[in-house]
């Protein structure tokens, strides 16, 4: 009982501790880092503006300047307000882009922190991980073949079923955003069309090589439920 409690606490710490540390790190440095970046990196931004979305917004501002030339007959106060508005929008655009870049850096940093924490768990907590593995194996072994077959069928339908495409798109979009990469629909579509197929092949091979050997009755129940 004591070993089970220790394993449960260890598993909870694996799940929540990396997230809590990375979240605290991000929130404690986010505001200071963004303010520093906005005050010291604006000139670098103006010399290195290549992103398509930012260019589109600057083109819109340029069109406003053309509109300014067309409105020369308007009162000077209106034209001055127009120039001031364009200037403010440009500054806001710089700050928004800088915040996006800083969030990308912070996301990448927190992911690196999580990786090192989990690596430390795997190296320093080898005995606890072995105990957790044995408890999970014991729990699965005590389940009936019907429940095992139902769980396998549910998991495969979620991962490689007909309606799993949208779920994979959301997962890959979230992962790319979390790592700070711009969402590319073509890359995501390519991964969605190939990754479930690879998983399906691996799963069928696993059934053929592993389940047929250790539990033929489970394979029979699975195929009957799948049909």
Swiss-Prot record:
It catalyses: K(+)(in) + H(+)(out) = K(+)(out) + H(+)(in). GO terms for molecular function: antiporter activity; proton transmembrane transporter activity. One of its GO terms (biological process) is potassium ion transport. It is a multi-pass membrane protein. The keyword Transferase does not apply. The chain crosses the membrane at residues 5-25, 112-132, 143-163, 187-207. The keyword Chloroplast applies. It holds the Pfam family CemA. Coiled coil: none annotated. It is found in: Plastid, Chloroplast inner membrane. Its main location: plastid. One of its GO terms (cellular component) is chloroplast inner membrane. Keywords: Antiport, Chloroplast, Hydrogen ion transport, Ion transport, Membrane, Plastid, Plastid inner membrane, Potassium, Potassium transport, Transmembrane, Transmembrane helix, Transport. Contributes to K(+)/H(+) antiport activity by supporting proton efflux to control proton extrusion and homeostasis in chloroplasts in a light-dependent manner to modulate photosynthesis. Prevents excessive induction of non-photochemical quenching (NPQ) under continuous-light conditions. Indirectly promotes efficient inorganic carbon uptake into chloroplasts. Belongs to the CemA family. This is Potassium/proton antiporter CemA. It comes from Phaseolus vulgaris (Kidney bean). The gene is cemA.
């Amino acid at each position: 009982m004591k070993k089970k409690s220790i394993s449960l606490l260890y598993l909870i710490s694996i799940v929540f501790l990396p997230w809590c540390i990375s979240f605290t790190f991000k929130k404690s440095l986010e505001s200071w880092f963004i303010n520093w970046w906005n005050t010291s990196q604006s000139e670098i931004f103006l010399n290195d503006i290549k992103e398509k979305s930012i260019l589109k917004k600057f083109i819109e501002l340029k069109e406003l300047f053309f509109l300014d030339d067309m409105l020369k007959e308007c009162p000077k106060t209106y034209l001055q307000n127009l120039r001031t508005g364009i200037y403010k929008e440009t500054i806001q655009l710089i700050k928004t882009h800088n915040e996006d870049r800083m969030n990308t850096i912070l996301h990448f940093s927190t992911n690196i922190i999580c990786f090192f924490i989990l690596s430390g768990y795997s190296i320093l907590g080898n005995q606890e991980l072995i105990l957790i593995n044995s408890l999970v194996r014991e729990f699965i072994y005590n389940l009936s073949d019907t429940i095992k077959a139902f769980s396998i069928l549910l998991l495969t339908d979620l991962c490689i079923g007909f309606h799993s495409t949208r779920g994979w798109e959301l997962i890959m979009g979230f992962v790319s955003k979390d790592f700070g990469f711009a969402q590319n629909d073509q890359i995501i579509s390519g991964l969605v069309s190939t990754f479930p197929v690879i998983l399906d092949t691996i799963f069928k091979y696993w059934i053929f090589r592993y389940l047929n050997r250790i539990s033929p009755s489970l394979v029979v129940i699975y195929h009957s439920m799948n049909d």
